[in-house]
């Protein structure tokens, strides 16, 4: 049965029966990959090169190169790096009939990120020659194909009983050393990475073990949701847009994990259809997506945090690799096509028809600490989509300071950055807990526009604390229209004489509409303005 025809109640069973790989195939794949790993560790290399360890994990996906050093090695600007952009056998999210894995080998001949960059071609050629010997020892049919990532990997296809798995062999620098627990490594590992000015995700294979742990910790049902999203990506999205530069599967994996954490509160007992529906709905909000974790690196670290904050100021969607602080996923890809297909599926896919998605925002809430000049402090948790004016309204509720008398600033290194009312926190890259400084000011004059029934516009200088009646008197003084004949509207609301302009949230450069109350006749109606 195709996914399109699966009912909501049958979705869990369909995923288990259709997408989970067979037990026999999984066991055979593990055995075969283990044989390849054993060969690489015990037979392949001469005594001067040691294999520290091998890791079976997920497939790689190309990303563009921009590093001039790498271009100098003969790689084109579109050459791909093997980066952690899929999910599969090593993480427990493999699909039935067709899946993928990386065999990452950590070699003693790479003593730094730079050496990995420089020595890769020679090592790959050596492994390719030696790997031919392994083919006769395997119970699987093995074919060695041209590498999907030229100059970065060896590509194998293992087949048995109609099921196959693609394997990439990836020689890598052992940046982490012995990984014994699921915790953050020494921050110096990431500082050294930043020092080599790598392209996004260039050395992501160095952090394979952390990427694997991040996904493998997920409960079984979440892994089935990951399988479902991957199936949608491979069998529905990609055939719809063959050849399109779509974002990598790994980005959708991370979005799915984020969705579960936020929408199901990391609970193992969740509704599969609701989770799937929520992921598709979030894909439609890709322009607002900003996702990151601080499991293995921290924004609090001076050097790493500064780099991460630069990434968080980039255009959305922003999805950061939880194990590699240089890995920003899916930039420049066709998220619009993903959103279009997600919307089509939400409207017509039987398993999510009528399903209510979880209440998940495309970016995590942030906690702001607002500091007054007298030492007062206020903590507010809001969405990054909150505008500065809305934030000022929240501050006003707590401290009683009118929004028009508040000036908020960020305090990055150097000159303070004044935050403007009409912009959102997200527009300033505030996707993380931040401290803002509040200065109380006297209401400043601002220019507003008054447009009459003839579409003629005049500019007036007012203060937010001016009343509507005071504005009417200014109109009377300039245009000769009696106050009692004026009817003013703003944002589809009639303005009452005793209220202030700030009460109606009148901003600089706002347009207020002027209508005339005619004696003994009908009142003219300005387009877009309500009747009294």
Residue ranges with predicted function:
Residues 1-45, 71, 132-138, 170-179, ...:
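Long, low-complexity, Ser/Thr/Gly/Pro-rich intrinsically disordered segments that act as flexible linkers
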Residues 1-99, 105-124, 146-153, 194:
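N-terminal regions immediately upstream of nucleotidyltransferase
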Residues 28-37, 41, 46, 50, ...:
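Catalytic cores of NTP-dependent nucleotidyl/adenyl transfer enzymes across multiple folds
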């Amino acid at each position: 049965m195709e996914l399109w025809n699966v009912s909501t109640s049958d979705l869990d069973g369909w995923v288990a029966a259709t997408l989970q790989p067979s037990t026999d195939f999984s066991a055979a794949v593990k055995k075969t990959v283990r044989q390849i790993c054993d060969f690489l560790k015990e037979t392949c290399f001469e005594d001067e090169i040691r294999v520290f360890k091998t890791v079976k994990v997920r497939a790689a996906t190309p990303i563009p190169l921009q590093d001039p050093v790498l271009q100098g090695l003969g790689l084109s600007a579109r050459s791909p790096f093997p980066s952690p952009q899929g999910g599969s056998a090593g993480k427990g999210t493999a699909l039935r009939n067709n899946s993928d894995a990386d065999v990452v080998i950590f070699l003693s001949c790479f003593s730094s990120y730079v050496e990995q960059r420089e020595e890769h071609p020679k090592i790959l050629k050596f492994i390719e020659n030696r790997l031919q010997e392994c083919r006769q020892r395997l119970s699987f049919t093995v074919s060695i194909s041209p590498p999907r990532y030229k100059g970065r990997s060896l590509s194998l296809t293992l087949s048995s009983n109609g099921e196959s798995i693609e394997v990439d062999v990836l020689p890598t620098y052992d940046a982490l050393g012995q990984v014994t627990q699921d915790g953050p490594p020494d921050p110096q590992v990431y500082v050294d990475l930043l020092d080599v000015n790598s392209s996004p995700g260039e050395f992501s294979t160095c952090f394979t073990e952390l990427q694997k742990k991040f996904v493998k910790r997920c409960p079984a049902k979440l892994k089935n949701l990951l399988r479902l999203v991957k199936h949608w990506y491979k069998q529905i999205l990609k055939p719809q847009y063959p050849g399109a530069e779509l974002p990598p599967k790994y980005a959708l994996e991370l979005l799915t994990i984020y969705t579960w954490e936020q929408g199901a509160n990391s609970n193992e007992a969740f509704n599969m259809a609701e989770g799937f529906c929520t992921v598709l709905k979030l894909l439609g909000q890709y322009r607002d997506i900003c996702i990151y974790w601080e499991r293995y690196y921290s924004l609090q670290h001076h050097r790493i945090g500064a780099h991460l904050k630069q990434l968080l100021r980039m255009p959305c969607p922003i999805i950061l690799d939880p194990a590699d602080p240089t890995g920003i996923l899916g930039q420049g890809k066709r998220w619009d096509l993903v959103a279009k297909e997600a919307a089509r599926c939400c409207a017509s896919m039987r398993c999510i028809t009528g399903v209510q998605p979880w209440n998940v925002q495309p970016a995590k809430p942030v906690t702001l600490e607002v500091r007054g000049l007298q030492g007062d402090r206020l903590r507010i948790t809001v969405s990054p989509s909150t505008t500065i004016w809305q934030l000022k309204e929240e501050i006003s509720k707590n401290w009683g300071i009118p929004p028009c008398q508040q000036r908020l600033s960020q305090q990055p290194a150097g000159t303070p950055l004044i935050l403007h009312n009409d912009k959102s926190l997200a527009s300033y890259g505030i996707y993380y807990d931040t401290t803002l400084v509040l200065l109380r000011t006297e209401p400043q004059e601002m220019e507003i526009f008054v447009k009459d029934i003839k579409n003629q516009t005049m500019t007036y200088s007012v203060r937010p604390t001016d009343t509507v009646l005071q504005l009417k008197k200014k109109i009377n003084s300039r245009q000769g229209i009696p106050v009692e004949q004026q009817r003013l509207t703003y944002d589809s609301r009639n303005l009452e004489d005793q209220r202030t302009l700030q009460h109606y949230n009148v901003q600089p450069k706002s347009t207020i509409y002027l209508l005339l109350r005619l004696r003994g006749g009908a009142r003219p109606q300005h387009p877009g303005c309500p009747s009294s």
